Design a protein with these regions (language model features):
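Transmembrane-helix signature of polytopic, membrane-embedded enzymes
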Residues: 1-13, 31-32, 260-264
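Short helix- or helix-capping micro-motifs
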Residues: 4-15, 39, 63, 67
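Short acidic/glycine- and proline-prone juxtamembrane loop motifs at membrane-interface regions
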Residues: 19-30
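Membrane-interface transmembrane helices that cradle and orient dolichyl/undecaprenyl
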Residues: 35-55
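Membrane-interface alpha helices of multi-pass inner-membrane proteins
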Residues: 54-70, 80-81, 99, 103-104, ...
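Perimembrane helix-loop-helix junctions
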Residues: 76-109
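Membrane-proximal stem/loop segments at transmembrane-domain junctions that anchor or position
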Residues: 117-215
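Membrane-interface anchor segments at the N-terminal boundary of transmembrane helices
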Residues: 189-273
Length: 321
């Protein structure tokens, strides 16, 4: 109960979410799916075999619909799979894998048949499609942020001209030119940009020629007179939650608590998101659909955080005597 209350308190003070609700984009549209998948996974652990079948199907639907909005949702399914393999729960792993993969395949085949038979020409779609490695390539130039030059580079080649091979060659050339030190510096820059801004980029949507100016624009738009106050507060809350999360992770390493072990896949998910974003285009919005996962991980760190604070206080007292 105390964890639930603490999570609500953290959420209540995280004002950036009040504005993100109006930003109708894939990041926010997919925000419920990672935590819903994990919720179903936890429920399956205490269910009968018959009930588990229904839950596994729901897990497959959750990942399928979520990944259609934002394909990064699939990271939590991978994390759960790794957790099951580490704990040698091979049967459960196989059942979840079959459920998720089967539903994704059925849905994608059905969706593609419908779209290509009624709305899209397959060859035109191939030509207009932007391959995933485009964003990997973009993440290796400058600070890794969006740049129109890379978009023009990708569009310069037709699908039939082996666009993917041209992009892959450019990726390897950029890695080679950066070298180890350059890659490390870029990783630090991208880490700060991706995880170091508590506004979660909501202003990117509200800065598109608003029809009317309101007092809120003074706070949430970068050119507003109060934006720095808002950004500083939002980022402070964000960093506080990250500190709680890291404290909980440390407590997990130092403890054999079974309750904490159940949450291992959540910490693995955040690590997976971090690794993914190091390879992707730099954008502070791209982890926001996993913000609820970070909240849960941070909430679990409150006990360990208080314990560390009390121990530090005692050490300071002893040092002053």
């Amino acid at each position: 109960m105390k964890y639930a209350v603490f999570a609500l308190v953290l959420f209540g003070f995280s004002v950036q979410f009040y504005f993100l609700g109006g930003a109708v984009y894939t990041d926010m549209l997919s925000v419920m799916f990672p935590v819903l998948f994990f919720y179903l996974y936890l429920n399956s652990k205490e269910q009968s075999e018959k009930r588990k079948i229904i839950t596994y199907i729901l897990m497959g639907l959750t990942i399928t619909i979520g990944s259609l909005n934002k394909f990064t949702v699939i990271i939590i399914a991978i994390a759960v799979g790794i957790d099951l393999l580490i704990n040698r729960k091979f049967k459960e792993f196989a059942k979840i894998l079959v459920s998720v993969v089967s539903i994704m395949m059925i849905f994608n085949v059905t969706f593609n048949l419908y779209m290509y038979s009624s709305h899209l020409d397959r060859q035109t779609a191939k030509g207009e499609n932007t391959p995933y490695n485009h964003w990997v390539m973009m993440g290796l130039k400058g600070d890794g942020v969006y740049n129109p030059e890379d978009y023009e580079f990708t569009r310069k080649y037709d699908y039939d001209e082996n666009r993917n091979s041209k992009i892959n060659k450019e990726i390897f050339d950029r890695i080679k030119n950066l070298g180890f030190c350059g890659i490390f510096d870029l990783a630090m820059t991208k880490s700060t940009a991706d995880f170091g801004n508590g506004t979660y980029g909501a202003e990117d949507f509200y800065n598109c020629n608003p029809q009317t100016d309101t007092k809120l624009h003074d706070w949430i738009l970068p050119e507003g007179k109060n934006y720095k106050k808002y950004a500083t507060y939002a980022t402070s809350m964000h960093i506080a939650i990250l500190i709680f999360m890291l404290t909980a992770a440390w407590g997990f390493v130092c403890s054999d608590d079974e309750k904490r072990k159940k949450m291992f896949s959540l910490y693995l998910t955040i690590f997976g998101v971090y690794l993914f974003l190091l390879c992707w285009e730099t954008n502070r919005r791209y982890f926001s659909n996993f913000a609820p996962v970070i909240f849960i991980c941070g909430t679990l760190g409150i006990d360990k955080f208080i314990e560390v604070c009390l121990k530090t206080k005692e050490k300071i007292k002893c040092g002053l005597k």
